[in-house]
A protein has these predicted regions:
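Generic non-transmembrane alpha-helix signal with a bias for helix starts/N-cap capping motifs
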Residues: 11-12, 150
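M16 family metallopeptidases and their MPP-like homologs
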Residues: 3-4, 15-68, 74-127, 139-147
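Generic marker of residues within folded, mature protein domains
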Residues: 8, 33-35, 134
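His/Glu-based metal-binding/catalytic segments typifying zinc-dependent metallopeptidases
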Residues: 1-11
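Proteolytic maturation boundary segments
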Residues: 127-170
Length: 170
């Protein structure tokens, strides 16, 4: 749910900033992929080449503020809970999605009635719960992968004083 607020929804903080406020990208999207013992976090932001450095700095600032200096508030909590609950019926629209939920229950050791409890679990989320989750998403252990015209992008990255490793396309 915290990821939805950061970059998982079209109304997420990152999308509203980079796309709507600044106009540097068609969209920003993030996802936290649940696998056993890990939670890989991916963020995609195809931005204008001339704004690569600015966008990277803005995204890093938004992520640093997420759950800390700009914590998730009750309005955001209500939005993500409502979205989560309303999206539940769509998660079981076909046999494949039902099978996927059964498989995930087995993989993660969940009870067979886990899906029946999801609406209540969403509704029980507090802003404190979401802010704790936000800190896990944005703990700073990030690897940034930037793809673009090196002549145009590298000087922008140099201004950010981030370590850069250049790999050329095969």
């Amino acid at each position: 749910a915290a990821n939805d607020l950061l970059g998982g929804l079209s109304t997420s903080r990152l999308n509203l900033n980079i796309r709507e406020a600044k106009g540097w990208a068609y969209g920003v999207q993030s996802l936290a992929s649940l696998v056993q013992q890990q939670l890989p976090f991916l963020l995609f932001a195809p931005v204008q080449t001339d704004r690569t450095g600015d966008a990277l700095a803005a995204i890093a600032a938004d992520m640093a503020a997420f759950g800390t200096t700009r914590p998730i508030d009750s309005a955001e909590r209500n939005k993500v809970v409502e979205n989560g609950v309303r999206s539940l019926p769509g998660e079981f629209e076909n046999a494949g999605s039902v099978l996927t939920s059964i498989e995930r229950n087995a993989v993660f050791g969940r009870p067979d009635d886990y899906q029946a409890t999801l609406a209540a679990r969403y509704k029980a989320l507090t802003t404190a719960d979401l802010n704790r989750a936000a800190l896990q998403l944005t703990d700073g252990a990030m690897v940034w992968i930037v793809v673009g015209d090196r002549k145009l992008v590298e000087p922008q990255l140099a201004k950010l004083k981030l370590p850069v490793e250049v790999r050329t396309a095969p």
